[in-house]
Curated annotation (Swiss-Prot):
Alpha-L-fucose 1 binds at E126, W185. This is Fucose-specific lectin g276. It comes from Arthrobotrys oligospora (strain ATCC 24927 / CBS 115.81 / DSM 1491) (Nematode-trapping fungus). Disulfide bonds: none annotated. Beta-L-fucose 2 binds at R163, W242.
Amino acid sequence: MPFEARDDNVDPDAIGNHYHDDGLLWQTHYAAVEVFDYPHATMHMKIFCQSYWGELHDLTFSYKRGSTKEPEEENAWETKFRQSLARPGTDEAAMMHTPLAAVVRYDTGNPTTHLFYISTGFKIREVIWKNGSQTNDCLGITVCPTSSLAVTKWGAGSQTHFRLYYQSKAGTIEEHCLDCNAGTWTKGATLSGPVSAYDDDSPLRGTSLSFINLAQDKPELRGYFQTAKGSIQEFTYKGTKWSTSKIGVDAAPFRTPLAAITVEKNKIAALYYVDAYNRINEVLWEGDWEGSERIDGESVAPGTRLAVASLKYIGHDKIHMFSSGLVNVITQRVWTRENGAWGDRPTIVDFEAPVQVEVEPGLDPAIHLTKPTRDGRRV
């Protein structure tokens, strides 16, 4: 029987300078995507997370050279841009500890980034960045308050297809579909039965979800979830119907985070989860599932979420993994194909919540710094 990950007596209210009203939300969810801007020959990565009062943040990191072909050293990443969205007290406000899922499409010639999150009314919202503009719309899909979110895609020519996954109020794993040219979301498949105390293979309420596609131009979909018994299982779809199978992880801490990705030209699938000792584990598929192994000896924060994104070049593969460190900072781990291993230690991604100054004319702004309130105002 799985059990909850131990917390090592960590008190989030005593974390230190990294835990404060303007800082990163303790146990925030993450989403990460790689973005290739071919018209401008630039390459960057976006990380999405949530801060203390519930605002969502978009952090953009870019290679110094801005090359789409030449990788730099790992610490050559530098903060390029940061913005806040889904502010508290607005119609776009996100629920606290909202799950996050993101995807990028290229069928318009320029990269278009889509971010999905859950509102305070437990409905899925979608933020789209396209050609320098941003929209935020409610999809009208009501989810379980503890639902996770996952998204994947495939495309051929000028048409891209999205598949969005979530958990319903009954606990079933549901799918919504978008053919991007059509522009309208439609209901897709129901992948599982409801949560059941009598079925060990039914989804755990609040299970993490992660989906990938093993093909670029057609659906060869795989999705991962945790069962009521605590095992991690796999959904598989190859264009006809969904099936469910085991991957060899029979017990993991309840609600362990799941993050999956493909490497080696989609020949290998990698799934990551956190064990009971707050270490990240990896399970690889290359025609068959291999045993679970820890990727390093470094602990993550209890209750952390995971996000992974890949940067792929000719002859190069990199996986960037993001999680929360023990002092409530964003940490990054990097795997490279050249080394065939993860780096020695995770590095810290700088997160500084924006400070706004609102003062009357003639007053010194240095002594009138403002801070956000729970309803989104600044006082």
